[in-house]
Amino acid sequence: MGKIRLSEPRRNSDGLDWDDRVRDRISKLQPNEIGYQQVKKVIINGVAQQLKDHETILEVVLSKPILPKSKVMIDLQFEAQVPLQVRRSGRDNKEGIRYSMSQWYPKMVEYDYQGWNANPYIAREFYGVWGDYDVNITIQKDYLVAAGGDLLNPAETGFGYPGSNDASKKSTGNTITWKWQAYNVHDFVWAADPQYKIITRTLANGPLVRVVYKQIDSLEANWQRLADSMVSAYPIIARTFGAYPYKTYTFIQGGDGGMEYPMATLIKSASIGTAIHEWMHSWFQMMMGTNESLYAWMDEGFTDYATNRVMSEMRRETGFYFTNSYRSYLNLAKSGYEEPASTHSDHYNTNYAYSSAAYGKGAVFLAQLGYIVSDSLLNKILLAYYNTWRFKHPNPNDFIRVAEKESGMELDWYKEYFINSTKTIDYSVGDVNMKDGKALITLKRVGKMPMPVDVLITFKDGSKEMHTIPLNLMYGNKPAESSIPWFTETEWKWTHPEYAFSTNRSVKEIKSIEIDPSMRMADINRVNNRLIIPD
């Protein structure tokens, strides 16, 4: 991995923008500890093809074009060495897991409307092709194998899988072949360890959930709690984001931390928050199949939004769920390191800018969309997005079009400002005067990004009014979101830095005026959002 020297090192940094999970560990590996894949042959319909090696990308020079909708048989022969665990795939990680087998085979590059997506692999994001996997894993018989798929021969393998017995202990020979199947997925992950233990939960109207972990008595209760938590999480997930379409999902202790794959994830420990996050990737990466290299915010950000929402509902929390996401984005916006969230994942100047944009700003994009169109319409958008685009590789325009259809508003401006630029939001309460016996309130747009504006007026007698000011670029307005008196004002033209509106009461009756009391608008300076009228 590369490194960038920052002019102002962030907290917990030595001045180098390392990925702390990698740093210089790869350079210190011995020859028998490095990982590699060496493709020996690619044979198509019986004909060997010319190969060009570009490090992590293998180019196959076809002897004959493969035409659209035609079928070919590809025989790919390769050798690989399993590395000492550093990132993603490997053996003997810090938790003592013997094999964490992700990125373990040559994976087909996705060809879409933009052509080939041949991004060199630098242990960040990847974009794959859906297919049907039939995988046979032959390994010493004392190993339990976990994988993202359905086990076809549990009676032969044993180890507590549903339908299994102690056949593995009675079998002759030193090895057993585990037969796995995963259909309509774009990757396949597995892990193996002789001290693995498995527990299962069957979710109502949902999948069979497996939790596979290294047996340590002191941690047993943690893994049981993780399994139990999925029972309460799934109804929230399905109701909000759509049903999980596969028969099984497996949480596997392994790898170097949370990393998502179809039908399974690798996690280090029994963190319920991490587990929920990785499972939610099944909606925004595994089912949608968005090009995560180009649109990481559509996967990591939407997944972070979903994680916060599901965890908060599980805990029966009320109020604002997304404080950490907003804090992450606002810190980035003020740091001087921000780049547009539309930047390719591999080409950010700093890891900090990438992670804060992909996770924090991506989550804020959804939460703030609820502010623009209303949370009730956002809920409809999320389900419509799932129903319209699962298994179809959507891009940002596809999501925006769904949001526009469900809300009846124009929203391309929102993507262009918030994702394609680094312009920030800052609104302030300006002057308050009397005109024709009514209070005339002036608002100012200080930042460069225009937004619709909600204004709460609290009166000295305790009564309140909410005034929502649509942005003219929306060509519409959101419905009322509360039971207090709700007034929709005339639209605010995006070219105008100031806007004024009236309330039917006098200035002396007003106690305070506050912009965006819900805190959903990502205003970089909330100090000027509230004005208290002195007695």
Identify the meaning behind each predicted range.
Residues M1, S70-L84, Y133-K141, W178-V185, ...:
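Short, hydrophobic/aromatic-enriched beta-strand segments in well-ordered soluble domains
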